Amino acid sequence: MKNKLLIRINNLLEIEEYYKEGITNFLFPLSCYSIGYNTFNLDEIKSIKDKYNVNVYLLVNRVLDNKDCNNFKLIIPKLSFVNGIIYEDIAIYQMLKDTNINLIWNQAHFAVNYHSINYWLSKDNIISCMLANELEKIELKTVLDNVNKKVILPILGLNMAMYSRRTLLKFYSDTFKTEYTDVAILKNDAVEFLAKENEYGTVLFYNKYFNLIPELEHINDDKI
């Protein structure tokens, strides 16, 4: 099972401990192209691959504008060392579809039926899909029984509930003259959210971990 785990990295110092435990697949949110997580530049990521000889994947989860796309095109020649890119904006697919770079489709809440999933899996360099974590057990079984390639199943983390390209925390701070922070807890009587912001926008996570680990023994992992 360890060889199937993909760990998103928050701090480069974590990797040594994961590596000692036999984990060799790591996901790095890419600087300038990711939101909601600590990010890393290509030099940092490549140094990890060179040091540990592990599989490295990039997370590109921002909505990109034309300038972003043009800038991304400039780094494509530097991406040959990565094992794959988990992307959200279809522009990434359009820019990389004629390369040898492996892609993993990840449109957040949309990967909930095998028809959509298989459409993307039919593309030449799309090797997998990140399933939505809203799937009920019977829905998950149906998807796994019918997908044409192996997929990625989220098993532990926070659900991203909202993403805005606006810097909402800064807007609030400027409007109400409060001290600005790029991380905040927002809550009312019913629910609590973790807000994170960078120059590219703001995301809200439902501030309670989903945990699928206890259910793994009941899930057929042939397609995972």
Across the structure, where does each feature detected by a protein language model lie?
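Active-site pocket-lining/capping segments in soluble small-molecule metabolic enzymes
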Residues: M1-Y119, M130-I224
